[in-house]
Amino acid sequence: MPNHLKRPIHCTFATAMKQFNVPIIYRSPLIAAVKNKRRQEDKMKKDFSPTLLDFGPLQLYLARHFGFCYGVENAIEIAFRTIDENPGKRIFLLSEMIHNPQVNADLQDRGVQFLQDTYGKQLIPFESLSKNDVVIIPAFGTTLAIEEKLRAIGIPIQRYDTTCPFVEKVWNRSEQIAKKNYTVIVHGKPTHEETRATFSRAAKAAPAVIVNDMAEAVVLGEYITGENKVDDFYSRFAGKYSNGFEVEKDLQQVGVVNQTTMLASDTQDIADFFKQVMIKKYGLDESTVDKHFADTRDTLCYATNDNQSAVYGLLETEADFAIVVGGYNSSNTSHLVELCEERLPTYFINDEDKIISPDEILHYDLHQKLEKQTKGFLPLKQPVKILITSGASCPDALVEGVINKLAGYFNAAIKTGAFIKKFS
């Protein structure tokens, strides 16, 4: 069995059930009814089994957790409120608010301009800004260098900062272990906005280095054990380590934090790996390993963990294929796709329009980085069983759109209203 499917991470997270003022176009009466019923029946979030929408010839299984998380709803509320509160002003986003094309397009339609693209390429120069402009910091956060540029212009960044509180929790934990002289290892994609922001803060407080995956973690571990030559480190990890990084000195004590949208199980595996490296190198045991390894498992994002655990539960159901809905550049959504792909055919789409007909679907291939067309995706049998989930930046309305599109092919869309009553 593939490693991802062996061991979901089961943690308990306490979260406030705040109600956010999110545009109604992103809401779904059906999905809201399903989620509310499941929430009432499973207040401790112990049950990760899916919800069945039985249309007769079509059976749709919805993941226990999916869609907008706390951080995303918080960011959307602040962004749209900022627009309403600043009529006539120029409003900018540092980059995409979240990795969802519909939400970003809606903000642009309201006049918001992006200063950078997802990868940090400048679209509008900072020099063109004035202190009278409004700049919104996205949910991923931003680097200290960019914050300083905005302050120098006179722009009040705290007022329009939508950084996810769970991302800030990672930053705070990095600072805490840095004060105890641990080097911060960031598990994340080096070009992702959140990883750049986290690395920026970690590197200010302590030596820091980024690892993209377990393969890179193993290589870094070999520098700790002395199996790799120190001089090779600087080319192997070019652009991924802090200024003045000294391999032999700075890898004696380490702690691992992550880009919150990475697979929780992958981050835990990487942390466990470095823990074992330290135990072996310094002759430690569980009671003494904290001299060289900081336990940071409390920084794992609850929403990422819930959505991923829900996919493990979803995959316990035998089905014909899975559909994952979300932005193609969304890291957390991509990981859900990867989990599903290991078990059954999976179609990654960003809205219902990608389902062209009962015989044809346009979907994104993560590996080839392009959209592909697949014919005959609906099997000629009944009932057709489909697993459905979505990323943390995907509006529930898009998922309902997919449900209605599929149900329409089986003359079953009329049952959607009945499901709302059933789950209400």
Locate predicted features.
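The feature marks the mature, well-folded catalytic cores of soluble enzymes
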Residues: 5-424
